[in-house]
Design a protein with these regions (language model features):
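Pocket-lining segment of extracytoplasmic ligand-binding domains
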Residues: 32-34, 44-148
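An extracytoplasmic/periplasmic, membrane-proximal ligand-sensing/linker region
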Residues: 145-207
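Immediate post-signal peptide segment of exported/extracytoplasmic ligand-binding proteins
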Residues: 34-45, 197-207
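Residues that flank catalytic or metal-binding motifs in active/ligand-binding sites
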Residues: 22-24, 42, 135
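Short, glycine-/small- and polar/acidic-enriched structural segments
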Residues: 1-34, 101, 131
Length: 207
């Protein structure tokens, strides 16, 4: 949206645990036998993160819309770990959070955020369905920066991400483990999702 309105360019994409894309997951309690597929969430209580969260609301909302599934009462928990906790505590029937594939034999999705409180969360909460993938967040450059300077900045960011101190800093800030070159074309799916939902970047920024 910033590309269309202001001429901004996405020239880098974040990488986490070797993945440059991510998706959302729909979670429910493992012992809830009434929920075996997404269709079973019709009329159920569902927790989302917040109205501006891509993985915690917009991607799941698009999934429900595409499948023509109307849930029951919805709540915004404001944080991904809160969504998981609400499901664990049976405050809601299901919830939507970010999904990251397992790495080194351990889960990396939102359930890991509550391991300290609920060591058995992986057994107690199941993944009902995953959404389609979209690219991780980009590094965006404003309109008007000379091409030569943009090229140097892109290379500098990539070099930073691959230096031990740079990797450590990026990991601490946002769990970013690397960066790769990209383009605005790679974010077409995100723009199409917002259009399908009748959303705009401006409306989400006001939330």
């Amino acid at each position: 949206m910033a590309h269309q309105k202001y001429g901004a360019q996405a020239l880098l994409t974040s990488i986490r645990f070797g993945h440059s894309t991510y998706r959302s997951q729909i979670l429910a309690r493992t012992d809830d036998e009434s929920i075996k597929s997404l269709a079973d969430l019709k009329g159920k209580r569902v927790a989302f993160v917040d109205p501006a969260s891509t993985s915690g609301y917009l991607l799941p909302l698009k999934l429900f819309k595409d499948r023509k599934i109307k849930t029951g009462k919805t709540v915004f928990a404001m944080k991904h770990d809160n969504v998981v906790s609400m499901i664990y505590q049976k405050q809601v029937d299901a919830g939507a959070t970010f999904y990251t594939p397992p790495a080194e034999g351990e889960i990396q999705d939102a359930r890991r955020l509550v391991f300290a409180q609920y060591p058995d969360v992986e057994k107690k909460i199941k993944i009902v369905e995953l959404t389609d993938e979209i690219p991780n967040e980009p590094v965006v450059f404003r309109k008007g920066i000379p091409e030569a300077m943009k090229s140097k900045l892109v290379d500098a960011f990539i070099e930073l991400a691959r230096r031990p101190d740079g990797k450590e800093a990026l990991t601490k800030v946002s769990s970013i483990t690397d960066l790769k070159k990209s383009s605005d074309a790679e974010y077409k799916a995100v723009r199409e999702m917002l259009t399908a939902l009748g959303k705009s970047a401006e409306s989400l920024m006001r939330l």
